[in-house]
């Protein structure tokens, strides 16, 4: 089994491509969804409130605002949540060893040094204009958080340079499908 990490800048199309791969029958893991599931655990919520006493009650939007405005709080939360995320990722890989490929979307893959858990990395990219257009359509969009995420993340060009493969999501669906088909063919040569 090959483990493929998918990364990219905010609103670059990572989740769209992960969902496309899932619809095609590939096993997929989404770090953001995993963290949302972890956050539902009352014990974990209590631990986070102790870790971040600035929060009066557990609220994901308040956590986002805090961690994108306070580097120390962000680091504390990452140091707490990343080991749990790694455990879930390792379990996902163990449960799917009978598949040729598994795909995992990890937005901060390089920044959090998650690349060590993957055989190959694919960076999804598109223009800044397209990313902004996509971002503003999200219910949770906040321009300040968007800019802070851009500041925290490696540049799109750096992610492309580090990756084994890159997919331009700023194209029509037919072209995108061609790129994904080419990726799968390239990966099949590696099995």
From Swiss-Prot:
Catalysis performed (reactions): 3'-dephospho-CoA + ATP = ADP + CoA + H(+)
Function: Catalyzes the phosphorylation of the 3'-hydroxyl group of dephosphocoenzyme A to form coenzyme A.
Name of the protein in question: Dephospho-CoA kinase
Family: Belongs to the CoaE family.
Subcellular location, record wording: Cytoplasm
GO cellular component entries: cytoplasm
Gene Ontology molecular functions: ATP binding; dephospho-CoA kinase activity
Major location category of this protein: cytoplasm
Top-level taxon of the source organism: Bacteria
CDD domains given in the database record: DPCK
Matches recorded under SUPFAM superfamilies: P-loop containing nucleoside triphosphate hydrolases
Residue ranges occupied by any DPCK domain in the UniProt entry: 3-191
InterPro entries in the cross-refs: Depp_CoAkinase, P-loop_NTPase
Keyword ATP-binding tagged: yes
Keyword field: ATP-binding, Coenzyme A biosynthesis, Cytoplasm, Kinase, Nucleotide-binding, Transferase
GO biological process, one term: coenzyme A biosynthetic process
Keyword Cytoplasm applies: yes
Top-level enzyme category: transferase
Residues the record lists as binding ATP: 11-16
A Pfam family the protein falls into: CoaE
Listed pathway(s): Cofactor biosynthesis; coenzyme A biosynthesis; CoA from (R)-pantothenate: step 5/5
EC number: 2.7.1.24
């Amino acid at each position: 089994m090959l483990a493929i990490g998918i990364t990219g800048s905010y609103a670059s199309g990572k989740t769209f491509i992960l969902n496309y791969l899932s619809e095609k029958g590939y096993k997929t893991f989404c770090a953001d969804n995993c963290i949302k599931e972890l956050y539902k655990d009352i014990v974990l919520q209590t631990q986070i409130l102790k870790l971040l006493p600035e929060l009066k009650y557990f609220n994901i939007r308040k956590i986002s605002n805090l961690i994108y405005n306070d580097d120390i709080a962000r680091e504390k939360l990452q140091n707490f949540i990343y080991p749990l995320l790694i455990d879930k990722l390792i379990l996902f890989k163990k449960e799917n060893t009978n598949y040729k490929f598994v795909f995992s979307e990890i937005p901060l893959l390089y920044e959090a040094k998650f690349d060590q858990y993957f055989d190959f990395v694919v960076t999804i990219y598109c223009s800044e204009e397209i990313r902004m257009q996509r971002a503003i359509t999200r219910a949770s969009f906040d321009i300040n958080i968007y800019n802070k995420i851009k500041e925290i993340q490696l540049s799109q060009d750096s992610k492309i340079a580090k990756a084994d493969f890159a997919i331009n999501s700023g194209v029509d669906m037919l072209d995108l499908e061609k790129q994904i088909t080419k990726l799968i063919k390239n990966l099949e040569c590696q099995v």
